[in-house]
């Protein structure tokens, strides 16, 4: 297997690892690892890492990682997290794709906004992306490439707003935002989604209030 050369630039603040920026450098071939929703990895990271991490370009894949820090995904970049533990928040704005699979854990919140590609945070159905554990809130706002939030245990609130169906040749089941089979500790709020969200006949457990669109139903 050939490996993409990559650079991790680390800034030191007060003697601690502060920021790690992942940037792919051209190489003869990409890492031969396909990840659901994000395509082929251009940079793969495994093992322990301390400090905040920014996925700057290409597709960054975290496999069996324990990260003590937050993650930011830059516009146009993609991130896949599989079998990993993140002790911090995850924030994406304008990402090309985001995947969170196979019992991964996040110690903070997940915020995904204005993404142009598919967002897969666990699959509550029969897919290959098992849900994970998210201690904080989940916010999904103004994404246009398809969204699925399934089979997760979520400690905080879930807010799903202004997401629109992807255009061009997507499966029917991916046209609407899917929120299915989650256990949600906080509120579930949906608004302004086109079309309205579906639970794909796999209800969610919500320990607080449910409001907006289909999400307001006690059977959603």
For the regions a language model picked out, list residue spans one by one.
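C-terminal region of N-terminal signal peptides and the immediate post-cleavage residues
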Residues: 2-3, 8-11, 19-42
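Feature marks extracellular polysaccharide-active and adherence modules
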Residues: 56, 63, 68, 74, ...
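N-terminal segments that cap or nucleate solenoid repeat domains
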Residues: 33-82, 218-220
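Leucine-rich solenoid repeat scaffolds
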Residues: 169-220
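Primarily hydrophobic membrane-targeting regions of prokaryotic envelope proteins
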Residues: 1-2, 6-11, 17, 71, ...
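Acidic/polar low-complexity surface segments
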Residues: 97, 101, 116-130, 159, ...
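Hydrophobic alpha-helical membrane segments, chiefly transmembrane helices and signal peptide h-regions
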Residues: 13-26, 52, 72, 76, ...
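Short, solvent-exposed linear patches
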Residues: 116, 143-144
């Amino acid at each position: 297997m050939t490996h993409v050369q990559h650079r991790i630039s680390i800034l030191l603040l007060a003697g601690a690892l502060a920021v790690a920026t992942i940037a792919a450098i051209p190489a003869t071939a990409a890492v031969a690892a396909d990840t659901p929703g994000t395509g082929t990895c251009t940079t793969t990271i495994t093992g322990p890492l301390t400090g905040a991490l920014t996925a700057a370009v290409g597709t960054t894949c975290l496999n069996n990682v324990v990260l003590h820090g937050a993650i930011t995904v830059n516009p146009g970049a993609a991130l896949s997290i599989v079998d990993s533990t993140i002790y911090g928040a995850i924030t994406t704005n304008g990402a090309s794709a985001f995947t969170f699979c196979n019992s991964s854990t996040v110690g903070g919140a997940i915020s995904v906004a204005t993404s142009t590609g598919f967002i897969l945070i666990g699959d509550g159905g029969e897919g290959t992306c098992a849900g994970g554990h998210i201690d904080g809130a989940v916010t999904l706002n103004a994404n246009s490439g398809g969204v699925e939030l399934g089979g997760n245990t979520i400690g905080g609130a879930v807010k799903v707003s202004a997401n629109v169906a992807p255009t061009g040749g997507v499966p029917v089941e991916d046209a609407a935002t899917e929120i299915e089979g989650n256990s949600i500790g906080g509120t579930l709020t949906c608004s302004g989604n086109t079309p309205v969200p579906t639970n794909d006949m796999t209800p969610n457990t919500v320990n607080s209030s449910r409001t907006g669109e289909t999400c307001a139903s006690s059977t959603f």
